[in-house]
Amino acid sequence: MAKFQPKVQTEGQDDGMREKMIAVNRVTKVVKGGRILGFAALTVVGDGDGRVGMGKGKSKEVPAAVQKAMEECRRNLVKVSLKNGSIHHSVKGHHGAASVELHPAPKGTGIIAGGPMRAVFEVVGITDIVAKSHGSSNPYNMVRATFDALVNSTTPAEVAAKRGKSVEDIFA
């Protein structure tokens, strides 16, 4: 059976949060009496200032699945440290067979990333970044790998605190 997956990412803004729908999958459960159709939606929500969340919702209808996914996004917000519209340093993230590499970029570069990663960067507030994905191109795995990378990035202050030095000593 063919996959139902719109390539268009929808965007909405509610209560200051940016919402993006990444994928909608049509799923089928085969039972004795025939097939039962359902839908699964993957969405991300962010405030454009470093907070981002992802969610997956399932239902018999698309709007209900998207609504459930958006609610889960708002429950699972995480804070990401940003530096002038980019990240502090290069970082890698993994989930399942998907792995991503994120590299900071100078102002004016834009978001150089494909598919689901681009949606995450847009809602979190990153304007300049270079990203590369390896392995699985499954949207769910790519979003989780991107979250893994963003959450594992550290600020210079955190590195200095771990080493017991000042921030100036880290850059010297």
Swiss-Prot record:
<dbReference type="InterPro" id="IPR000851">
    <property type="entry name" value="Ribosomal_uS5"/>
</dbReference>
<comment type="function">
    <text>With S4 and S12 plays an important role in translational accuracy.</text>
</comment>
<comment type="subunit">
    <text>Part of the 30S ribosomal subunit. Contacts proteins S4 and S8.</text>
</comment>
<dbReference type="InterPro" id="IPR014721">
    <property type="entry name" value="Ribsml_uS5_D2-typ_fold_subgr"/>
</dbReference>
<dbReference type="InterPro" id="IPR013810">
    <property type="entry name" value="Ribosomal_uS5_N"/>
</dbReference>
<dbReference type="GO" id="GO:0006412">
    <property type="term" value="P:translation"/>
</dbReference>
<dbReference type="Pfam" id="PF00333">
    <property type="entry name" value="Ribosomal_S5"/>
</dbReference>
<dbReference type="InterPro" id="IPR020568">
    <property type="entry name" value="Ribosomal_Su5_D2-typ_SF"/>
</dbReference>
<dbReference type="Pfam" id="PF03719">
    <property type="entry name" value="Ribosomal_S5_C"/>
</dbReference>
<dbReference type="GO" id="GO:0015935">
    <property type="term" value="C:small ribosomal subunit"/>
</dbReference>
<dbReference type="GO" id="GO:0003735">
    <property type="term" value="F:structural constituent of ribosome"/>
</dbReference>
<dbReference type="GO" id="GO:0019843">
    <property type="term" value="F:rRNA binding"/>
</dbReference>
<dbReference type="InterPro" id="IPR018192">
    <property type="entry name" value="Ribosomal_uS5_N_CS"/>
</dbReference>
<feature type="domain" description="S5 DRBM">
    <location>
        <begin position="17"/>
        <end position="80"/>
    </location>
</feature>
<keyword id="KW-0699">rRNA-binding</keyword>
<dbReference type="InterPro" id="IPR005324">
    <property type="entry name" value="Ribosomal_uS5_C"/>
</dbReference>
<keyword id="KW-0687">Ribonucleoprotein</keyword>
<comment type="function">
    <text>Located at the back of the 30S subunit body where it stabilizes the conformation of the head with respect to the body.</text>
</comment>
<keyword id="KW-0694">RNA-binding</keyword>
<protein>
    <recommendedName>
        <fullName>Small ribosomal subunit protein uS5</fullName>
    </recommendedName>
</protein>
<comment type="similarity">
    <text>Belongs to the universal ribosomal protein uS5 family.</text>
</comment>
<keyword id="KW-0689">Ribosomal protein</keyword>
<dbReference type="InterPro" id="IPR005712">
    <property type="entry name" value="Ribosomal_uS5_bac-type"/>
</dbReference>
